[in-house]
């Protein structure tokens, strides 16, 4: 189904051609003065230069050619040469009925689907998820859902931090505490126990303890580095411990991500890419790309057009150890070999931009990807507290993600219980659903690259540009539809009719933008565009609702039409919030 703006542009193009002007000037856009018109075309202004005529003369001629159009209800030429338009009410309602019949509500599916990998999440194993992991998870999940809706094959990868010194630190601390464990006996050749020698709680306490010790005790740090080296060079007992660390951590991470309604297709980590490093580095040397500088192995990635310095991409340190860049490049090699993606999107902190400029350029220069492979950096800003500084606990620590969600749910539960009587269990379930909308919408309504203030009071409000307000609107629609059916009528039997009031038409106009918004959100990796859209749509619905006696009217034809309009509004809103990663309860 074509987008409304494309249909209107095609109609205006016919008029430009009939008036003797090039159709390329006929592009229609949404009006920037909705008080005057719904759509506008500024093409006469540009055409004036080519045809050496006053813009208003061209606009008048085009408007003349548009008389009698069934697409437009009103058309006006306005000085100095704007063409203002209002769409025909009947034409608009026909468009919405077409949307209603289509299971995708007018959204085209990709003709040539791509394989897209999204690298998001990125938690370190053996550490609890904290608020710093929130944005990557929420934005990545939404971008994944939007791309799937657009018809592409999408693979989400959590890309665990499961390699490097942190593993050596855990092994060293574990050895100090439980030296009798079979994993530390180098002579042992049997099977290792299936059960981990620690719980998630112990693991989360072991790492910070070990990290603290390594900063105070040089010998301890040396032991941890040696353990890391032995792990990375295949020591059996340490490899078995790594498996336990991963299993225990990933089980806990999955539980926490599930509470966020975030899931991944792949639970791979940095360790999975390690086998690809030796061959990759050798090829870079053989190809003449990698060279030794200050005893480190590097690849030059600067370009003549650079406006700031881009340092060489370091592959190996002077001691032969790999770095994040090495692992990220090897991960690209692994992904190309196993999944051959057309596009890889990295949803990471925007402060890592230089790192990824180096990685992407190195990957291209050394032929790790094809000419057609797109590597995208989707950098996000910081989630700040009300003081404008990175969000912390009251005592200045980094807040665990599960505690943040608990705080939000408790605030939401309090508001729900204050607003209406509800059974405790139902109220708690509703608070979880609405609380998640508060967190996700609060984040996603901001452009990803921008910093934002995490304000519990504002995000949990059922008024204003918030998740609970959107859900409140959906619940209101569900309630009206329920009452309509309880009166013995069947919803959806009537067609959506031409708008009978300004507020009804305004709602219909908002609905007609749906496929255009979804397309833009996919192309720009921009969930905030969906948030802005559903806020406008919810406002348009609520204005229509307050001005219209939907259930109290005696006009059955109008009522049937309105109910069909409500069904479409609910479908669009529910599809959009699914793209954002949350759902609506039955009651609030």
Protein language model regions, located:
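Short, charged beta->alpha transition segments
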Residues: 101-110
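Non-catalytic interaction-recognition regions
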Residues: 1-93, 110-588
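Short, charged, solvent-exposed linker or helix-capping segments at domain edges/interfaces
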Residues: 94-99
């Amino acid at each position: 189904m074509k987008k409304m703006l494309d249909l209107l542009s095609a109609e205006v193009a016919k008029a430009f051609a009939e008036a003797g002007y090039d159709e390329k000037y006929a592009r229609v856009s949404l009006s920037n003065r909705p008080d005057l018109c719904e759509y506008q075309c500024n093409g006469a202004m540009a055409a004036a230069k080519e045809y050496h005529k006053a813009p208003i003369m061209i606009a008048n001629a085009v408007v003349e050619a548009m008389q009698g159009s069934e697409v437009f209800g009103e058309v006006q030429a306005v000085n100095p040469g704007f063409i203002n338009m209002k769409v025909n009410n009947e034409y608009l309602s026909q468009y919405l009925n077409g949307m209603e019949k289509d299971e995708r509500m007018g959204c085209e599916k990709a003709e040539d689907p791509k394989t897209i990998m999204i690298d998001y999440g990125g938690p370190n194993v053996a550490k609890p998820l904290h608020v710093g992991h929130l944005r990557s998870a929420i934005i990545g999940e939404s971008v994944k859902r939007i791309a799937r809706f657009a018809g592409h094959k999408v693979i989400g990868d959590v890309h665990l931090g499961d390699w490097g010194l942190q593993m050596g630190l855990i092994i060293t601390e574990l050895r100090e505490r439980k030296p009798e464990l079979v994993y530390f006996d180098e002579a042992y050749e049997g099977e290792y126990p299936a059960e981990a020698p620690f719980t998630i709680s112990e693991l989360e306490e072991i790492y910070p303890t070990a990290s603290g010790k390594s900063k105070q005790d040089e010998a301890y740090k040396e032991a941890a580095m040696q353990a890391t080296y032995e792990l990375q060079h295949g020591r059996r007992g340490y490899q078995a411990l790594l498996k336990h660390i991963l299993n225990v951590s990933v089980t806990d991470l999955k539980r926490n991500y599930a509470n966020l309604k975030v899931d991944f297709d792949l639970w791979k980590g940095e360790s999975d890419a390690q086998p690809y490093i030796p061959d990759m580095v050798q090829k870079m040397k053989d190809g003449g790309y990698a060279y030794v500088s200050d005893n480190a192995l590097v690849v030059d990635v600067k370009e003549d057009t650079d406006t700031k310095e881009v340092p060489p991409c370091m592959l190996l340190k002077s001691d032969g150890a790999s770095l994040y860049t090495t692992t990220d490049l090897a991960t690209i090699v692994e992904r190309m070999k196993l999944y051959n993606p057309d596009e890889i999107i990295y949803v990471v902190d925007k402060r890592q931009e230089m790192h990824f400029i180096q990685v992407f350029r190195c990957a291209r220069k050394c032929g790790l990807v094809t000419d057609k492979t797109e590597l995208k950096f989707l950098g996000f800003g910081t989630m700040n507290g009300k003081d404008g500084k990175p969000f912390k606990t009251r005592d200045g620590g980094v807040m665990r993600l599960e505690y943040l969600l608990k705080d939000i749910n408790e605030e939401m539960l309090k508001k729900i219980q204050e607003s209406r009587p509800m059974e405790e269990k139902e109220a708690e379930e509703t608070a979880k659903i609405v609380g998640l909308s508060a967190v996700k919408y609060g984040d996603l309504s901001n452009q990803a690259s921008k910093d934002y203030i995490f304000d519990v009071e504002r995000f949990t409000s059922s008024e204003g540009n918030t998740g609970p307000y959107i859900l409140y609107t959906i619940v209101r629609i569900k309630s009206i539809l329920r009452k309509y059916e309880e009166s013995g009528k069947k919803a959806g039997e009537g067609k959506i009719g031409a708008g009978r009031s300004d507020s009804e038409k305004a709602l219909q106009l908002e609905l007609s933008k749906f496929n255009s918004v979804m397309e833009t959100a996919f192309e720009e990796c921009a969930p905030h565009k969906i948030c802005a859209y559903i806020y406008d749509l919810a406002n348009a619905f609520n204005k229509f609702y307050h001005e219209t006696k939907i259930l109290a009217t005696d006009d059955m034809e109008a009522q049937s039409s309105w109910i069909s309009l409500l069904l479409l509004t609910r479908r669009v809103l529910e599809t959009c919030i699914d793209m954002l990663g949350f759902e609506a309860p039955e009651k609030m």
